[in-house]
Amino acid sequence: MSEHKIKPVTIQDDKYRFDAFKNGEVLFGKKGRLPAMGWNSWNAFGSGNNEELTKAMADKMIELGLDKYGYIYVVLDDGCYASKRVDGHLASDAEKFPSGFMAMSDYIHSKGLKYGMYNDVGDRLCSGLEVGTVGYEEIDCQDYIKWKIDYIKVDNCYNIWDNATFSCPKNAKYTFAPDIKGIKLVKVSKEGMKSSNLEMGVTKYSISDGKITGERAYIEGGYATGIGTFDGTSPDASPVSELSSEVHFNVNVSEDAEYDLYVDARCRTREGSGGWLQVAVGTSYYYDDLLVDSVDTEICTDKPIRIKLSKGENVIRLMNHRRQENTLTSYAKIQECFEKLAPEKDILFSICEWGKTQPHNWGYKVGDSWRILNDITFQVGSDGDPGTVSWEGAYTTSVTAQYNKAVIMDEFAGLDKGWNDPDMLVIGMNGMTDTMNKTHMTMWCMLNSPLMLGMDLRRVEKNDDIYKIITNEDLIALNQDTLGVQAKRIFTSKGVKPDTTYLRDNDRVDVLAKPLSDGSVALSFINVSLGFREDRISISPELIREYIGGKMKDADNFVNASKYKVKNLWTKEESVVEANEVAEKGFNVSGLAATDNLTLRIIPM
């Protein structure tokens, strides 16, 4: 991938800035959706999906009655397009989809299903096809509207402003600030002349005088480096930590005045060290550009940046949040075009940037869901091969790597925001036992994750083991409950704070609690490990209220119930338990087989 010579768009509106990420303002799209349910071609067929296979999947969805359970989207993933644009427009691969996308849309809609497609905010798709949306947003949205799509998944490969997957490594100049050694301030007199001294003669500040915020940056060799945002495609950083870093200098002045700021910096083009600098005093921005035209140098800049300081204490912020801001802007551009061209259309927008820029912080502004990590598997299937996945494995490619991150991200999800997406379901792929499949389904339902099937549905028959798992109405009801609350982990056998501690050691049992719209609570005991766990765990109504009471329909009614109706959502066994027995024993489990779960719906009576 070649290095781009142009620069990212100038941010004219502060609503796209990092400082606005927590303000709750939705920029584009509709809220109030429950997690999407359907089928996506990628895990089943990779880039080998075609018209015949897609029609067969749509037919099978109806034959199996999956639409009656809520699986309504049929999504064409990567590999469906021609390798290049035709007269500036997207076109179908003539061999794979000879009838074209409109015919595919008509076929899927004729089944009463909804039609989804795929693209990328980069200049290519992840498969390398040179048909990414960047620069073609309005043309592409026109085509998608013409094809009557109901859903779009948008990837993040070949991002021209990030050193993301398949992108130019030198794009790090856009995603990280220069390494900072210090600053110098020169006061500008009212006549426009510069004074070499501030009050008390102090004009220079070394990095030791500053303060690093967040967990990404650190001091090395007298420089602050890593001024930017953690790459969230890796599982190394907790999603509930402060993932972006700035360098702050507190400066006290005796009067309002203008100053020229000189930044003693080192510009590079590698992960953690870049060339793009943002300068603000408080929330007022004064600079947002490459610090020098030629990066990858060891020189310090003598470029003055004019700023205003107010009488008293000022916080000068040196930072680069463009990794997040550029990505938000790219996704927003697509949504803006949809809204401009067809505001009446209801198109579900699935952000697939793999957690790269921490989209749980900004994704709600433009999307209905956002991927939180790299792919759950890179061993996808093909026609005749179901593909392979691991329960646990190296780095990100496993069921538990996705779960371990998503399980502490509940506060970022909701009907007013959207949903954390730990990738598509891998039920039916090689490497998964029946027990794993059940627990995987439980996890995704409790976490309010999108339920997108990723298997060759021709391998499923009514009432076989796979069918019974993916059509478990009691589990689906948790995911689609109208209260729209992701479960919270309220206990873990690791003995740490359960709701926010990022755990990657799978030798444990977790307990998740999910409030439901009828006043009941779903409680799931999950053995995350590959071995039998002997733990005896008891959960009281009071503990449930402590963690999720603020989101329950009526927490006091739940705690003070005289009895409880308890249903096992896998065995379907039901019992009524008196309050005094619950007070003595709690809702409990004694031992769980490897990768197994006990999931209960508890109804106060």
Task: Label every model-predicted segment.
Residues I316-R317, A579-M605:
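C-terminal beta-strand-rich structural cap/linker in extracellular carbohydrate-active enzymes
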Residues L53-N163:
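Aromatic-lined carbohydrate-binding/catalytic grooves of carbohydrate-active enzymes
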Residues S2-E51, E336-E339, I526:
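N-terminal module-boundary/linker segments of secreted carbohydrate-active enzymes
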Residues G221, G226, F230-A237, E411-D423, ...:
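Aromatic- and carboxylate-lined catalytic core of secreted/periplasmic carbohydrate-active enzymes
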Residues W444-L447, M452-G454, Y502-K553:
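Carbohydrate-binding surface patches
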Residues C168-E325, R533, I544-K563, G586, ...:
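Extracytoplasmic
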Residues P35-S41, G70-D77, K114-N119, D150-D155, ...:
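Structural recognition of the beta-strand scaffold that forms the well-ordered cores
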Residues N326-A332, E336-D456:
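Glycan-recognition surfaces
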